[in-house]
Amino acid sequence: APTEIYTLSLHDALPIQSDIQEDEFVDLLAASHGINLGFQYLEGARDIRADEIATIDEEFACKVLWLDALVMNVDRTVHNPNMMRSQQQRWVIDHGAALPFQYNWAAVMEESPRRSAYAMHHHIFGDRAKNLERWDKHLAAMVSKPILQSVVSQIPDCFLQPLMPRGTSAKTIERRRQAYAAFLWKRLKSPRPFIG
């Protein structure tokens, strides 16, 4: 089954309307001081604890590790798994530490996507994904350039504007969207810098 991923990022405040009155959800919304690209209430959800990681199948472990390595997400560790279980489904949450290059585009060079390795030994699945290289080709084939372009085309301007100078033109914002797609596309080229 496909894995759905919802991203939460915290920048400038944007009010969120919800009719869900669960205390925990209301508290999370109140504590979120930023733009939420995706936010979903998972009824009855609970954190997957570090001591439960051994029960997670290798396929899921490889897929999560591969995705985190692609987007350079360093925030899925033994101390902070950032995974939940709700109604027999596992959810990979909180991708706020992904794509760290976006905070300093001036430092991004043509070769940056290829140079950015990934410290897999820090990842919660770093020692569990024994067949990551076997999964690599299959997972990379699922991500095409048109898919990346389609995904970035859906990023709202208000999500990108806080990362750019005030008054940035719509044309420049669109170029930034395409820069995300280009960065990830270059990371996907074989041999991938985060595999091996």
Residue ranges with predicted function:
Residues 1, 8-196:
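Phosphate/dinucleotide-binding and metal-coordinating scaffold of catalytic cores
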